[in-house]
Amino acid sequence: MKNLKNLFLAVFALSLTALTSCLHIIEEATFRNNGSGSYKMTLDMSEMKGMMDMFKGMEDGNVLGTEGDSTSIQGEGDYTPPADPATEDPMGGLGDEMSNVAASIKGVQGISNVIEIKDTSNFNFGYSFDFTDVAALNRALKIINKDKYDTKVEEIFRFNGKSFERLAVGDLGAEMQKAMMENGGEGEEGGMDMAKMFLADMSYKQIYHFPDRTVKKSDNKISEITDDGHTLTINLKPFSEEQQKSKAGVAAKVKLK
């Protein structure tokens, strides 16, 4: 879980910097009647952008207003100091952890149209791909979980046309909680409380589309079904005390018709 832990600690650090926890992880999948479909994982930090831009503007203003800067070069025209890595890449490599998946799953049987999502302007990162059947989807996710998050996951989804199941594995929300707990040792309760406070509104949303079927029933207590019955949504908040008490999770058994 080393890579995953580093990823989530980077998220927390950015949350502290931006004074906001507007982080949304979105897992979206479409399952057609023949078992084929598409999968997309997105890390959406777009709501942080305004705050980060404001801080950058304040820093730029301070630089312009500084007099007698010892680093200035007189008589040599305009001088641009070397770019600060944090300014050059404010995400600290966070986007690479989410989006550099294409090389890992290209060539996997049953997987096609692999696309990296790396929108540094709007703080959106992730990946998407098409699959021929649920077995191909599970193969790809097994590779992604092993290579990128150092977790062993054999099977995440089951689908046979009449039923759908999302197993209680590969849960990024639960893994985030574990990563934060492992980072906090004895005597660091205050740090954990701060983490929970800043990440209380973080969401991990699963959206499942069934264009050829309608959802009859779901055993996940917080799942919601659209009026047309073709989409099921589970909106988790891993650091919400209310959801923690109710033991909310990603697992869902769904009956289709």
Regions found by a protein language model. Give the residues of each.
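Bacterial N-terminal signal peptides that target proteins for export
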Residues: 1-9
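Residues in flexible loops and secondary-structure boundaries
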Residues: 9, 33, 37-39, 53, ...
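Hydrophobic helical h-region of N-terminal Sec-dependent signal peptides
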Residues: 9-16
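C-terminal motif of bacterial Sec signal peptides marking the signal peptidase cleavage site
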Residues: 18-21
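Start-of-domain marker
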Residues: 23-110
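Mature, soluble, non-transmembrane domains
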Residues: 95-257
